[in-house]
Swiss-Prot record:
It is found in: Cytoplasm. One of its GO terms (cellular component) is cytosol. Keywords: Cytoplasm, Ribosome biogenesis. This is Ribosome maturation factor RimP. Belongs to the RimP family. The keyword Signal does not apply. Required for maturation of 30S ribosomal subunits. GO terms for biological process: ribosomal small subunit assembly; translation.
Amino acid sequence: MSSVVETVTDLVTPILQDHDFYLYDLEFVKEGKSWYLRVYINKDGGITLEDCALVSDELSEALDNVEPDPIPQAYFLEVSSPGAERPLKKEEDYQRAIDHYIHISLYQQINGQKVYEGTLTQLSDKEITLDYLDKTRHRQITIDRQKIAQARLAIKF
């Protein structure tokens, strides 16, 4: 399966670069009896449905022209946005999230909390700094990145 991901990544990257898009994530998974090739794309300012359709058409054509077929079994191709509350997986994801509202889940509590939501203000190799609201007071916390179980963009209400 990793060779499928690598092959598709190699195929889709120039397509995305031609349109000033970038690859957010790619997965090839089996759900029930069906296989799915999911390609998550984005661009500065956000991706549109038309952008997804364009990449889907171009990638589908590119996949059809590869010999030998990198995906011999039947599969569904899905090209989409990673979503408004997308996970932060790679370093670039964290870089793009600076000055954005994020949700952080920790492995262990810090100051009695395992979950924080706030604005990511600083980022280094070892830690992040988050501005968050504690009841009615603005506070700042610096969290060791190794203590983060999960991070994603969040919608502020």
